[in-house]
Each structure stands twice: as structure tokens, then as C-alpha cells.
Curated annotation (Swiss-Prot):
The protein's name: Alanine racemase
InterPro entries documented for this protein: Ala_racemase, Ala_racemase/Decarboxylase_C, Ala_racemase_C, Ala_racemase_N, Ala_racemase_pyridoxalP-BS, PLP-binding_barrel
Binding residue positions for substrate: 136, 310
Positions carrying N6-(pyridoxal phosphate)lysine: 40
List of catalytic residues: 40 (proton acceptor), 263 (proton acceptor)
């Protein structure tokens, strides 16, 4: 989707806030651990290239979801190590090797397909993925891990790392977390040899399970200033949200009592009402679920009325405002604030999803 620079709807990204959040984490974790930020999904909607360049001096490497995300960083001269967390097709391992991109090896079957490729494998770096209870990708027993190590050694593949991912580190009940921890430790104890990087700590584990001492801390949502648990667990230190979402009023009118607003005529005025139109809609990631939620105009909460359209939405105003008046969808205006987590709670989802759904059509402004 093409960015719309001539449309005054913007995501404002505070790169200093992201740097400050990383600095706070560096003080919180083990001094020997490297932070590898997750900049997948366009850095959770913040802009992967811009974020990576802004924090490169603070981190050991970066984590992305797929090979294309890694290639994008390399194409923009990001030189730090990069780990692809998802599996890739074996036919593309030569690209990763040539660009010094480390890959997740999710299974022995996958690695067998890799060595069948007519590619130079001596520059290939792999991190064996361990499924300790997430049920997503990775091996589940030490025998398979050791067979993978043996196969990697045979073909001069660099067994650089091994890792797992916790499913419930952001929950108050740590029963599942401890079970996963025990499963991962059991596999580690039976490995034929240890790699350079052993890592299992995601953002939530770094925040609430400091007993985990890892070579790499995979820092995600809290780097961008959000609590991975939503509002369930209290953060051990303050972090600053890095993204605000703003737009403006493009049309204002007073309509009579009994008039309807939007598709389906789902909102009817009970009295004369000022209605403002805002250029953002579900094609921008501001979903139809937002009907009935609030935005901020001049520091005051204003209700979203009628169904959110593809490109625009309507809000109920307390009075007339000039065209171009700022509308805050996420962020602070005077004494009031709307957080990403507030939006997520209204939608019945998580703050991660709210950020990741903000489409490329919304221009990003960096400060």
C-alpha cells in the first residue's frame, strides 16, 4: 500500500524514546547480555529501517520475522547481525549466507533439505529453534537437536545459537513458564556441544523473570514503550510510548436531531449535533470496531459515531472547530491521553496488534 504524504494522518515516532527504553533495559538485565531488538513487522509499525539505524549503537543485533525483512535492513546498510526467527524455504539459504543473516533451523527435516541445496554452506549461520511448549516451530527432543548439530558440522554450517520462546512470561501464573524453562534446560543439558548464543528471554521474561541469564535478550514491545501484559502486570520501571497517531478535521457540519451518520445508519442524533470528519479508516488499520470509542480534540474526548469507513470516520464534537484542527487517536492532548492499550482493550485484542495493523498508507514522522 502506498504511503499518503499529502493526507494529514500521521504516526509520529519518537526515536529518542525508543533509545531511552533500551537504555533502561540495559540497566535492568545482566551486564553481559546483548540486546537484540525485534524489528519485525516493520518494527511493530514504527519503521524497521529508521528504528534499526537509530538504536544500532546500543544493541548486539536484530531479530526479524522473515528473510525479506532482513534483506531490507541489509539494503539500507544496517550491518549488525540479524536473526530470522521464522523458518525460510531451503532454496533461499544461499541469500542468507551471502548477506550474513542468521537463520532459525526449525527441524532436522528442514536442515536435511538445506544440505541438499547446491549452495556454499560454510558461511551459513543457524540457531536451532526449540519448541518447549509454544507449539509453533522448533524441535522437541535433544536427540533431534544433536542430529542437527552433527549434520551442521558435517557440512561446515555454523551452529551459532539455540533458542526457545515463552508463551506465558507475561502472565501472573508462572506454571507454564516454569514448565517451558525446565524443558529447555533439559535439552540444553543433553546437547553434544553448546553454541555461542543461547537465548530464551523475550520482553516479558526480561521484565518479570530476571533469573534468566542469557547471551541474548530479545527485546520487543517494551522497546516501543508498551507493557507486554497489557494491564495485567506492573512494569518494574517506567518506559515511554514511542508512537502517537494524529489526524485532523477535514469537514465540520451541524446536523439536525433525527439524522443518521455512516453506513447502515447505525447512529442517530438525538439533538442538533456538530459532526466532524477525520481522514482515517479501516484501510489504515483503524478498524470498524472503533465505533463508539473516543478521540481527543482540543484535549477533550469526542465519540466516534457511525461505522468507521474505509478511508474516513466521523466524530461527535462539542462545538464547531476550524478545519485542520488536530485530532489525537493515540497519544496525549493537554491533560487527557489515549494509549495503544486503551485501543486494544476496546477492540478485545492486544496492543501489539493495534500497532502492527497501522498500514503503510499512514505516513511516519520521526523525531
Amino acid at each position: 500500500m502506498k504511503t499518503s504524504p499529502h493526507r494529514n494522518t500521521s504516526a509520529i515516532v519518537d526515536l529518542k524514546a525508543i533509545r531511552n527504553n533500551i537504555e533502561k533495559f540495559k540497566k535492568h538485565i545482566h551486564p553481559n547480555a546483548e540486546i537484540w531488538p525485534a524489528v519485525k513487522a516493520d518494527a511493530y509499525g514504527h519503521g524497521s529501517v529508521e528504528v534499526s539505524k537509530a538504536v544500532s549503537d546500543l544493541v548486539g543485533g536484530f531479530c526479524v520475522s522473515n528473510l525479506d525483512e532482513a534483506i531490507e535492513l541489509r539494503n539500507h546498510l544496517v550491518t549488525k547481525p540479524i536473526l530470522v526467527l521464522s523458518g525460510i524455504v531451503p532454496e533461499d539459504v544461499d541469500i542468507a549466507a551471502a548477506l550474513n543473516i542468521s537463520l532459525t533451523a526449525p527441524s532436522l527435516e528442514w536442515l536435511k533439505l538445506v544440505v541438499q541445496e547446491e549452495a556454499e554452506l560454510s558461511d551459513l549461520k543457524i540457531h536451532i529453534g526449540v519448541d518447549s511448549g509454544m507449539g509453533r516451530i522448533g524441535i522437541r527432543d535433544v536427540e533431534e537437536a544433536n542430529q542437527m548439530i552433527e549434520l551442521a558440522d558435517k557440512y561446515a554450517i555454523n551452529f551459532e545459537g539455540i533458542f526457545t520462546h515463552f508463551a506465558t512470561a507475561d502472565m501472573a501464573d508462572d506454571t507454564k513458564f516454569k514448565d517451558q524453562q525446565a524443558r529447555f534446560n533439559k535439552i540444553m543439558a543433553g546437547l553434544s556441544r553448546k553454541p555461542k548464543f543461547v537465548h530464551s528471554t523475550n520482553t516479558a521474561a526480561a521484565l518479570w523473570h530476571k533469573e534468566q541469564v542469557q547471551a541474548i535478550e530479545r527485546l520487543g514491545i517494551s522497546m516501543y514503550g508498551l507493557n507486554p501484559s497489557g494491564k495485567t502486570l506492573e512494569l518494574p520501571f517506567e518506559i515511554e510510548p514511542a508512537l502517537s497517531l494524529v489526524s485532523e478535521l477535514t469537514h465540520i457540519k451541524k446536523i439536525a436531531a433525527g439524522e443518521t451518520v455512516g453506513y447502515g445508519a447505525t447512529y442517530e442524533t438525538s439533538e442538533e449535533t456538530w459532526i466532524g470528519t477525520v481522514p482515517i479508516g479501516y484501510a489504515d488499520g483503524w478498524t470498524r470496531q472503533m465505533q463508539g470509542f473516543k478521540v481527543l480534540v482540543n484535549g477533550e474526548f469526542c465519540e466516534i459515531v457511525g461505522r468507521v469507513c474505509m478511508d474516513q470516520m466521523m466524530i461527535k464534537l462539542d462545538k464547531s472547530y476550524p478545519l485542520g484542527t488536530k485530532v489525537t487517536l493515540i497519544g496525549r492532548d493537554k491533560t487527557n491521553e489515549i494509549t495503544t492499550t486503551d485501543v486494544a482493550d476496546w477492540r478485545g485484542t492486544i496492543n501489539y496488534e493495534v500497532l502492527c495493523l497501522l498500514s503503510d498508507r499512514i505516513k511516519r514522522i520521526y523525531k
